[in-house]
């Protein structure tokens, strides 16, 4: 019998720095890399390398963000840092950089500021489960009473947004001093990583979640049935299993009689695969792009939901003017556009290009979605915004 291969891989966790401008997010990111590089657990990365974050596109939106990697004794981390406030908002709403947890940076000299609040609220809305606090600039604001007051304020704020403020770890440090190699402050970076290891939960791997495939195309194979193709978003599918076809039409069940990838027959397909799935007893006209194949009972179709959105600026290819209550664009979920109308929050009259807002959406046809589902807002095929479902209503 062949011996099982020794598995060296550590659990992979995605984190990111959040917090008010100039509170030290990028300096902390550089400090983590520099301190851990001394133990061979990261590549030393300079502040200016992180600060000139490259552009990337997610859901038709350009976002600047820097990605660094490091390891602790327990885990491997991918860490995202954004240069600008708008980049954070876009990043969280599009899910361009998925965050399993966050490191909230608060300057002990300033305490809680407007973007501190906004980032905590957004993290809550898009489902970041926990965060660790790094109270920065404690070398300057060295009065312990002042530090305690700031820590208390941060705990209260976290609690008010639904996080566990009472038990959230707070590390008192100085990112700049750690970056400069002062051993007293380097030790605080190790404390921070230990807190992240222990407080931020290991995410469920995509392959362990319930199966879901977004249908991109359909075809008939004479004598065998209907094949749907698309990317497996999560989970695993095996030949012989029953699936549900969800969205746009009433839910119907079907049995999988074959799976193909790159013209080869397979007995299973898993998260990340592009596969063709043969369905028994389903006619081609009964399935269409925009529906999903899913594990029975795991996802429901919805027409009405609440969402957090970002409206693109004119320079980003967005609208030139704001939109009002009742605006009817298309909502692009996974592989298809569905028209819907937007109801703004009570105290909002208009959403201007560059704004982020909480809205309620009512679609003309139900689509498979759940809390955390991402979508683009489009007008005539061009992206004018992006959003995350925060609550399904009906």
Swiss-Prot record:
Top-level lineage group: Bacteria
Chain sites annotated for binding Mg(2+): 26
Sequence segments annotated as region (G1): 19-26
Disulfide bonds: none
Region (G3): 81-84
Subcellular location, record wording: Cytoplasm
This protein's UniProt keywords: Cytoplasm, Elongation factor, GTP-binding, Hydrolase, Magnesium, Metal-binding, Nucleotide-binding, Protein biosynthesis
Gene Ontology molecular function, alphabetical: GTP binding; GTPase activity; translation elongation factor activity
Cellular component, GO annotation: cytoplasm
Region (G2): 60-64
Region described as G4: spans on this chain: 136-139
Location of the tr-type G domain: 10-204
Residue numbers binding GTP: 19-26, 81-85, 136-139
InterPro entries listed in its UniProt record: EF-Tu_GTP-bd, EF-Tu_GTPase, EFTu-like_2, EFTU_2, G_TR_CS, P-loop_NTPase, Small_GTP-bd, T_Tr_GTP-bd_dom
A Pfam family it matches: GTP_EFTU_D2
Catalytic activity of the protein: GTP + H2O = GDP + phosphate + H(+)
Family: Belongs to the TRAFAC class translation factor GTPase superfamily. Classic translation factor GTPase family. EF-Tu/EF-1A subfamily.
UniProt xrefs under NCBIfam families: EF-Tu (TIGR00485), PRK00049.1 (NF000766), PRK12735.1 (NF009372), PRK12736.1 (NF009373), small_GTP (TIGR00231)
Function per UniProt: GTP hydrolase that promotes the GTP-dependent binding of aminoacyl-tRNA to the A-site of ribosomes during protein biosynthesis.
HAMAP family: EF_Tu_B
Entry protein name: Elongation factor Tu
Species whose genome carries this gene: Mycoplasma genitalium (strain ATCC 33530 / DSM 19775 / NCTC 10195 / G37) (Mycoplasmoides genitalium)
Gene encoding the protein: tuf
